Amino acid sequence: MVPDLCVLGKAVGGGIPVSVLCGKMDIMNAYESGRVIQAGTFNGYTLGLTAIGSVFQIIEKHADNYYQNMERVMKNICSVLFESAKKVGFPVSVQGPLTCMSIHCTESELKSVDEFDGKVRFMDGVLRECFIGHGILNAYTSRIYANINLTEDDVEFFGKRITGALEDASLLLSRIKRGWE
């Protein structure tokens, strides 16, 4: 199935709020010929157009192998994570595709949604805040999203910060646990 029209959102602008309407030539020609009128506050605004241009440049630069590169970099980030966690003695597991992996404070992967209980969510939240405190950004669900611009420099960046984040999380959680006992 090929759509007649397609609307693309923020992804095409690398997170900048833009939208793109694209479609079959005969439909899009109606706009150019003046048969269809479209007006809006942000039509052709410079920031949005620049963001879209930058996204397309990045895609073109990595067009041959960007998924393989993302997975390779994320695999290296996982290796650094597990190595640091072992060194610190902090339980971590990684779930889901590497390009949008979730990190949990558990010895092994969660087998069901029931295992993602309040304790795990709380511990994941502490870890997430410690990540952020050390300059490692991740989503509210303790998820790390890859992008095609990641390089081994990002693995090095992660490696310089992850041990401190895990040590801080370990210290905070041990203090909290002592308070619970």
How would you label these PLM feature ranges?
Residues 1-181:
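Conserved N-terminal phosphate-binding loop of PLP-dependent enzymes in the Aspartate aminotransferase
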